[in-house]
Amino acid sequence: MSQSLFSLAFGVGTQNRQDAWLEVFYALPLLNPSAEIVAAVAPILGYSSGNQALAFTSQQAYQLADALKGIDAAQSALLSRLAESQKPLVATLLAEDAAPSSTPEAYLKLHLLSHRLVKPHGVNLSGIFPLLPNVAWTNIGAVDLAELAELQLEARLKGKLLEVFSVDKFPKMTDYVVPAGVRIADTARVRLGAYIGEGTTVMHEGFVNFNAGTEGPGMIEGRVSAGVFVGKGSDLGGGCSTMGTLSGGGNIVISVGEGCLIGANAGIGIPLGDRNIVEAGLYITAGTKVALLDEQNTLVKVVKARDLAGQPDLLFRRNSQNGAVECKTNKTAIELNEALHAHN
C-alpha cells in the first residue's frame, strides 16, 4: 500500500494484570515517515488505515526488521532489539494528527514533543488526561496502583525495597529521552512531553510541564507551565512563574519572546514580546493596571497589561514609593500610542 502517515513508532511498554497499558517507550519515533516505510510495515502489522496502536510479537518484530533493512537501517536495528523483549510490544501508526484515543497514542504524542520533532501546540493533545493512567513510578518501572501494595510487600519479604519516586500521570522526560545539548539539574522536574531546546539549562528550582518548553539556549530557574514556550536567549529567574492554560479557566496562550528576563519570584499572565524584563517579585496578570512611561519617564497613559502583550523592549517594574506597576520603554510617547493602537 502507498500511504502517508503523520507519525509511526515501534515501542515497548508496561501493562497491568488486566493487560491495560500503563506506559510506552518509543526509542525512535518518526514524524511523517516515508511511504516506502509504511508500505513495508503495513502488511506485517495488518494495518489498513486510520490511527491505530497494534500489538505485535517478537516474530513480527524480526519480520519488520528484515522488511526495513534496506529502507531504514536505524528502525531495522531497533526492531531487531525489540524482538528480544520480554515486555509487550506495540506499533503505533497515526494517519492524521487527531485527538489521541489510546494510551500508546498519547505516549507517542508526548515522545514527539520531547524528541523535538514537534513544538508545543504543534500536536493535537485534546483529551489526553483520561488516556494517561495514574501510576506509581518506581525503581522497577511503572506499577499499577492497585498492584502496588502487593509488590511492596513482596519486595520486603525478599529483603529489598520497592521505591516509589512519584505517583502521577506523567513520567519524567529523562527516563524516555535526554535531548542533546541540555542540562537538567533535577530530572524529576521535567515531564515527558516537554520540549527542551539545545543549550537549555534547567536548574533545581526549574520546572517544565508537558506541551511546554524552550527554544534554547536559556536558563530556567522558574516554572514553565503547560502550553508556555520560551524563546531563545531568555532566562527565568529563581521561583518565577508563567501562567498556564490548564487552571483558572484561562485561554490565553502565554509565551516568552527572545532575550527576555523574568526576575526571581516574578510572574506573567500575558505573553511577553522580545527583550522584555519583569522585575523580581512582580507578578503581572492580564488585568493588572500598568502606568506606561515614555523614554523621559513621563506618564503616557494607564493601560491593562494585556494591551502590552507581545510588545518588544519593555521593562515592567513596581514603583517602590507608591506601589504602582510601571512599564518603561525606550520609545517616545507618540511611538507608544501608535504601537498601542496598532496592537488593538
UniProtKB/Swiss-Prot annotation:
Q: Which GO terms describe its cellular component?
A: cytoplasm
This chain's protein is named 2,3,4,5-tetrahydropyridine-2,6-dicarboxylate N-succinyltransferase
Could you tell me what reaction this enzyme catalyses?
Answer: (S)-2,3,4,5-tetrahydrodipicolinate + succinyl-CoA + H2O = (S)-2-succinylamino-6-oxoheptanedioate + CoA
Under the heading Pfam families, the entry gives: Hexapep_2 (PF14602), THDPS_M (PF14789), THDPS_N (PF14790)
Please cite one Gene Ontology biological process associated with this protein.
lysine biosynthetic process via diaminopimelate
The places in or outside the cell where this protein is found are:
Cytoplasm
Catalytic site positions:
221 (acyl-anhydride intermediate)
**Entries under SUPFAM superfamilies matching the protein:** Trimeric LpxA-like enzymes
Oligomeric and partner information:
Homotrimer.
Key word Transferase present: yes
Instruction: Return the InterPro entries for the record.
Output: DapD_gammaproteobac (IPR019876), Hexapep (IPR001451), THDPS_M (IPR032784), THDPS_M_sf (IPR038361), Trimer_LpxA-like_sf (IPR011004), Type2_DapD (IPR026586)
* GO molecular function per UniProt: 2,3,4,5-tetrahydropyridine-2,6-dicarboxylate N-succinyltransferase activity; magnesium ion binding
What protein family is recorded?
Belongs to the type 2 tetrahydrodipicolinate N-succinyltransferase family.
> Which pathway does the protein contribute to?
Amino-acid biosynthesis; L-lysine biosynthesis via DAP pathway; LL-2,6-diaminopimelate from (S)-tetrahydrodipicolinate (succinylase route): step 1/3
Q: According to the UniProt record, what class of enzyme is this?
A: transferase
Organism in which the protein naturally occurs:
Pseudomonas paraeruginosa (strain DSM 24068 / PA7) (Pseudomonas aeruginosa (strain PA7))
Q: Does the keyword Transmembrane apply?
A: no
